Each structure stands twice: as C-alpha cells, then as structure tokens.
A protein has these predicted regions:
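ABC nucleotide-binding domain signature
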Residues: 39, 79-90, 94
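ABC ATPase NBD coupling module
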Residues: 72-86, 116-123
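Helix-to-loop junction immediately C-terminal to a conserved catalytic motif
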Residues: 56
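Pre-Walker A (P-loop) beta-loop-beta motif of ABC nucleotide-binding domains
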Residues: 28-39
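Q-loop/switch helix immediately C-terminal to the Walker
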Residues: 99-115
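Conserved ABC transporter NBD signature motif
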Residues: 64-72
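The feature captures the beta-strand-to-loop junction immediately N-terminal to the Walker
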Residues: 41-43
Length: 143
C-alpha cells in the first residue's frame, strides 16, 4: 500500500539573527496512509508549523524527501504541489479567506488549477462530500 504522504529523513535547518543554525526538524520520517487520523503535538516552537509548511511546499527542506501518493514532490513549487494537497487551517474563518465557508475553501482546493466555472453550482454538487469530510474533522466546523 502506498502512503498518501511520506517523509523520509526530513530535516529543516534555519539561521537565526546571529547566523547561528537551529535545527527545526531533525531527520523526521513518517508515513500517512488513507484512513489514518494523526495528531501532531508539541509546544510552542517545536516544529509543528514547520512540518506542515514543508509538506505544503511553502518551506523547503534542508535535506530529506517528501512523497505524495508515491511521487517525490520535494523540489516542486508550492503551486505544483497544490495539485496533490491543500490544507484548511484549524480555524479557517480566521485564515486567508475569512468570509468563505469551509466548504468553499474545500471547493477551491478540489479544483485548484482548473477552470472553476459556476462556483455556486459546483459547491452545491459537492455539498454532501464536503459535509462528510468536515464531520470527520469535527472541531465545531460542521455547520
């Protein structure tokens, strides 16, 4: 079975304001399969956001690889990587499109890179699918 997301020896090193290197991710390897429900826990500055940003492609790894559905996307631009994944923030109402519903955000993600056509009609046709996805996540976003 192919992992949906696979990180292998993922490392992210940054320089602070004094040219000192700080290791944010250190040789992280993980596999996420269909139907997995995972939680990433850690204190402030532990690397949770860095992990998600490297998977999404908004930050590059210093070393290691990222595969999505078996394809190495490590060097893909965020735009090219968006073909494979999107994310909705924990509180999407506070994110980059606060006036959009979670379902509207999911619709944009679903058709990224395609002509969108009649947005309300497409949204209505995927309403049940998106509602089921949102209910899996919970967190008060069901409505």
């Amino acid at each position: 079975m192919t992992a949906i997301v696979e990180l292998k020896n993922a490392t992210k090193v940054v320089k602070n304001g004094f040219d000192e290197e700080k290791i944010i991710l250190n040789d992280v390897s993980l596999e996420i399969f269909e139907q997995d429900f995972i939680t990433i826990l850690g204190g402030n500055g532990a690397g949770k956001s860095t992990l998600f940003n490297t998977i999404a492609g908004t930050l590059s790894l210093s070393s290691g690889t990222i595969r999505i559905l078996g394809e190495d996307v490590t060097k893909f631009s965020p735009e090219k990587r968006a073909k494979y994944l999107s994310r909705v923030f924990q509180d999407p109402k506070m994110g980059t499109a606060p006036r959009m519903t979670v379902a509207e955000n999911l619709l944009i993600a679903k058709f990224r890179g395609e002509k969108r056509g009649l947005f309300p009609r497409r949204l209505a046709s995927y309403k049940d699918e998106f509602q089921a996805t949102i209910e899996k996540v919970g967190n008060g976003l069901e409505k």
